[in-house]
Amino acid sequence: MNSLQALIEQAFENRQNLSLDTASSDLINAINEVLSGLDNGQFRVAEKINGEWTVHQWLKKAVLLSFKLFPNQIIDAGFCQFYDKIPLKYTDCSNEQFSQSGVRVVPHGMVRRGAYIAKNTVLMPSYVNIGAYIDEGVMVDTWATVGSCAQIGKNVHISGGAGIGGVLEPLQANPTIIEDNCFIGARSEIVEGVIVEKNSVISMGVFLGQSTKIYNRITGEVSYGRIPAGSVVVAGNLPSHDGSHSLYCAVIVKQVDEKTRAKVSINDLLRANQDD
């Protein structure tokens, strides 16, 4: 455990007794260092190590401490004002800085400081919360939201109105993770630390939380909390044991390898299942 982490961990344990007046300058500086590291990609709340996702809980704790200790302030957005504890990421960004970042931000695309946005990403009028990590080549479409500490892989498309859940409110143990080359359909919601593995396609209007049944029609298995790599997923229902009712589920209708995913359009993958 490094000294920065140790300071954050200790402060979080004693958070009930903390206030801006009682917090040390070392703690305030440590929190700001974490927020800056999250903002520029030096830190990330979760990362894949040896094929498994590891969550750095202390970084999340630093974000929570910032909410407790930092006062609200006026944020001038030009067309109106906001009043919040966390400033916006691009408030003071120059034309040169935008050009160097390689990010395109459409008017009303909102990103909080402490979220990392990699190059070749396009943000339509959308919202990205603090602690989120968005890798290269991502499209965040209109009215989509990327929640606090969510992890978005390379070349992901998050369609209009889709929601990727956060972990801060309500407090969740692990962030929601969308791995590389995934497509998230319009108005879908993926929350509560669900992991969508690489090369998967989530159809429009699919809702995934930790309690959502994920039915694999190929194997007949039911699982929770994770979509396997290369899955094509649609919304469905499973009947009760007595046949009196059915309840919502997500259905894995097929699984494709990376080569097939690269050759076949997303629309073709989804439409192929309408004939079954």
Swiss-Prot record:
A Pfam family for this UniProt protein?
Answer: THDPS_N_2
Q: Where is this chain primarily localised?
A: cytoplasm
EC id: 2.3.1.117
Q: Where is it found, in Gene Ontology cellular component terms?
A: cytoplasm
Q: What class of enzyme is it?
A: transferase
Q: From the Swiss-Prot or TrEMBL record, state where the protein is found.
A: Cytoplasm
Which reaction equation describes what this protein catalyses? (S)-2,3,4,5-tetrahydrodipicolinate + succinyl-CoA + H2O = (S)-2-succinylamino-6-oxoheptanedioate + CoA
Task: List the GO molecular function terms.
Answer: 2,3,4,5-tetrahydropyridine-2,6-dicarboxylate N-succinyltransferase activity; nucleotidyltransferase activity
Biological process terms from the Gene Ontology for this record are: diaminopimelate biosynthetic process; lysine biosynthetic process via diaminopimelate
Q: Which residues bind substrate?
A: R104, D141
Keyword vocabulary terms for this entry: Acyltransferase, Amino-acid biosynthesis, Cytoplasm, Diaminopimelate biosynthesis, Lysine biosynthesis, Repeat, Transferase
Q: Does the keyword Repeat apply?
A: yes
The answer to whether UniProt assigns keyword Cell membrane to this entry is no
Query: What's this protein's family per the entry?
Result: Belongs to the transferase hexapeptide repeat family.
For this protein, the record's HAMAP family field holds: DapD (MF_00811)
State the oligomer form and interacting partners. Answer: Homotrimer.
Recorded protein name is 2,3,4,5-tetrahydropyridine-2,6-dicarboxylate N-succinyltransferase
